Amino acid sequence: MAQTTRRMAEKLGGVTLRPVYQLLRPNSISGRTLNYVIKERLQTRRHLKWLVNATGVATQMLLPFARLAIRANRFLAARTPPASPLIEVSRHDHVDIDTWTSLWTKFKAVMPATCDRSWQFYEWRYEHVPDLRYGFSVAKRNSEVVGILVWRKPLPDELNVGTIVDILADPNDLDVVTALLGDALDVLSTTCESVVARTSHRALLAVLKNAGFLLVKRHCPTVVSSKHDTRRLFENHAEAILFSKADHDWDQIHVAI
């Protein structure tokens, strides 16, 4: 939302929420990917058009530095404390209705202002979506499901980027979140050049950064509603709002051109 539009919305009673952070965890980078990134960055800058046409040279110059920076970031991320041995994590292609609904009920009590994550959402978002296939890391503590992380590998015609789509767990339960994230990264980091994620919760942001994710950009959503109760819900639960890549189309196909 443009700043002018946001100010108009706020004057009409709209509620601007805390930032949603976009993060990236680089694992490696190929010349093809770096070339693509350079073109994307410079294609709207006419005064640098000559550099766009010479990206092969720019890529060769920048590639060693990019790889060195990635190695340094991975070295620092390797110091992240290991997950708690009390948390057991398993991987699945699907989640059953009882497991998902039970966890959503507990999650909603902790994060009441979060967008719908009901079973209907699960089916619509993960089961019936065309083309895309999702994986699920499920965490248990004392045989009780305490968290689910949804992840996605790239399609063959996409950029080689894995996606942390959603984390359905108490954001402040760091043992669970750390275990889930570690399991998902074990899957994605072996084949993906990088992994992306989004979150609006500061506790999750800290866990992601500790795991080697870098902050790319952020933006602040604004809630516009004629319902007073809806506005109050967001105003009174600033710490209980969670946005991720499951909201909107933030995890959809990114074609590598």
Model-assigned labels for residue ranges:
Residues 76-84:
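Short, conserved catalytic or adaptor-binding loops enriched in Gly and charged residues
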Residues 1-77, 125-128, 135, 141, ...:
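Active-site/acyl-donor-binding loops of N-acyltransferases
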Residues 3, 83-169:
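A conserved beta-strand-loop-helix scaffold within acyl/acetyltransferase catalytic domains
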